[in-house]
Curated annotation (Swiss-Prot):
<keyword id="KW-0963">Cytoplasm</keyword>
<keyword id="KW-0489">Methyltransferase</keyword>
<dbReference type="InterPro" id="IPR000682">
    <property type="entry name" value="PCMT"/>
</dbReference>
<dbReference type="GO" id="GO:0005737">
    <property type="term" value="C:cytoplasm"/>
</dbReference>
<dbReference type="InterPro" id="IPR029063">
    <property type="entry name" value="SAM-dependent_MTases_sf"/>
</dbReference>
<keyword id="KW-0808">Transferase</keyword>
<dbReference type="GO" id="GO:0036211">
    <property type="term" value="P:protein modification process"/>
</dbReference>
<dbReference type="GO" id="GO:0004719">
    <property type="term" value="F:protein-L-isoaspartate (D-aspartate) O-methyltransferase activity"/>
</dbReference>
<feature type="active site">
    <location>
        <position position="52"/>
    </location>
</feature>
<comment type="similarity">
    <text>Belongs to the methyltransferase superfamily. L-isoaspartyl/D-aspartyl protein methyltransferase family.</text>
</comment>
<dbReference type="GO" id="GO:0030091">
    <property type="term" value="P:protein repair"/>
</dbReference>
<protein>
    <recommendedName>
        <fullName>Protein-L-isoaspartate O-methyltransferase</fullName>
        <ecNumber>2.1.1.77</ecNumber>
    </recommendedName>
</protein>
<comment type="function">
    <text>Catalyzes the methyl esterification of L-isoaspartyl residues in peptides and proteins that result from spontaneous decomposition of normal L-aspartyl and L-asparaginyl residues. It plays a role in the repair and/or degradation of damaged proteins.</text>
</comment>
<dbReference type="GO" id="GO:0032259">
    <property type="term" value="P:methylation"/>
</dbReference>
<keyword id="KW-0949">S-adenosyl-L-methionine</keyword>
<dbReference type="Pfam" id="PF01135">
    <property type="entry name" value="PCMT"/>
</dbReference>
Length: 210
């Protein structure tokens, strides 16, 4: 999977490629869809959510430029697969999930497979996780109508935020935001994507958005 679906499509960061090769995606989906785990596409999980396609996980990780010293905030734990990838790249990953059922299952999987530098909690991801801020990296695996102000505030100086944003679920752009100093941010459009909605106080108000 790594060579054909990820490296061949432009992912060059050796640490990202190594992490993708180490994490068994089939362990993060239901048994009945495990045979599809290494296809490069999203797969359905509980609560109407999805596990992102491997290539998109790799793109977001590479664009975040994660170092071994970085503290990472992930918004949208989902199955725990992306958190497992990020845990191979960072010092610690704090992952916020809206759905308690998904959070508990992800926490169980991550602990079972030895990803001990991941902390999972339940809450409104659009508000971030202020307790452990600032973060060198914030990665958001759900798309909102705007970049949540709370996430910008919790980004460290020189930090990187990777987030899908758009006026509807059918029209999203993957954005990279770099915090240059206390008051200035630099924005870069990385291209079109499609993610589940970021629901919360600073995101969409419902799971269906038009």
């Amino acid at each position: 999977m790594v060579e054909k679906q990820i490296a061949a499509r432009g992912i060059q960061d050796p640490r990202v490629l190594e992490a993708m090769g180490k994490v068994p995606r089939e362990r993060f989906v239901s048994e009945h869809i495990a045979p599809l785990a290494y296809e490069d596409r999203p797969l359905s999980i509980d609560e109407g959510q999805t596990i992102s396609q491997p290539f998109i996980v790799a793109v977001m990780a590479q664009q975040a430029q994660i170092t071994p010293q970085d503290k990472v905030l992930e918004i949208g734990t989902g199955s725990g697969y992306s958190a497992a990838i990020l845990s191979q790249l960072a010092s610690h990953v704090y992952s916020m999930e809206r759905y308690p059922k998904l959070a508990e299952l992800a926490k169980k999987r991550l602990q079972e497979f030895g990803y001990n530098n991941v902390t999972v909690s339940v809450g409104d991801g659009s508000l971030g996780w202020e307790e452990f801020a600032p973060y060198e990296v914030i990665i958001v695996t759900a798309g909102g109508p705007q970049i949540p102000p709370s996430l910008l505030k919790q980004l460290a100086i020189s930090g990187r935020l990777v987030i899908p944003v758009g006026p509807s679920l059918e029209s999203q752009q993957l954005m990279r935001v770099m915090r240059e100093d206390a008051d200035h941010y630099r924005y870069e459009n990385l291209g079109s994507v499609q993610f589940v909605p970021l629901v919360g106080k600073e995101g969409w108000q419902t799971t269906s958005s038009s």
